[in-house]
Amino acid sequence: MADTFLLKIVTPDKDIFNGNIKRIFLKNSVGRLEILANHANMVTSTISSIVEFTDADGKDRKLFISKGIASIFNNEMTIFSESAEFSDNIDLNRAEKAKERAEKRLLEGNKYDKERAELALLRSIERINLKKMN
């Protein structure tokens, strides 16, 4: 049995990552998942969070993904996400301003705005956390 599997991370705009990895940690609405090579086939939703994986060379990598879908089939995993960014591509000032806007909308908004603001707040916090890790 192989100890690696193929990971593809895809957004509507571009492919973010395409390569073999040893393991990945990601989050769905239930909690944190660890996926290793030869995992059973499955499909799950993902939430905005920091994804951690170890590439085939043993290097640990982290990136932010927004909500999406993760599919595992025949030792290949594809994550389809609205957006995904490695730390190098995150603008910390922009993320902090997005956080401030979301917090303000939470205080002012109606129920619909509140739900959107909560999601925007989660995205901005996860981006900030990732940027500050590196």
Curated annotation (Swiss-Prot):
Highest taxon of source: Bacteria
Annotated GO MF terms: ATP binding; proton-transporting ATP synthase activity, rotational mechanism
Family of this protein: Belongs to the ATPase epsilon chain family.
Taxonomic lineage of the native organism: Bacteria, Bacillati, Bacillota, Clostridia, Eubacteriales
Keyword set includes Ribosomal protein: no
Membrane topology of this protein: Peripheral membrane protein
Any one GO cellular component localisation term in the record: proton-transporting ATP synthase complex
Record-linked HAMAP family: ATP_synth_epsil_bac (MF_00530)
Protein name: ATP synthase epsilon chain
Keyword field contains Ion transport: yes
Keywords of the record: ATP synthesis, Cell membrane, CF(1), Hydrogen ion transport, Ion transport, Membrane, Transport
Cited function: Produces ATP from ADP in the presence of a proton gradient across the membrane.
Signal peptide interval: none
Self-association state and partner proteins as the record states: F-type ATPases have 2 components, CF(1) - the catalytic core - and CF(0) - the membrane proton channel. CF(1) has five subunits: alpha(3), beta(3), gamma(1), delta(1), epsilon(1). CF(0) has three main subunits: a, b and c.
CDD domains: F1-ATPase_delta
Main location: membrane
Organism: Clostridium botulinum (strain Eklund 17B / Type B)
Subcellular location: Cell membrane
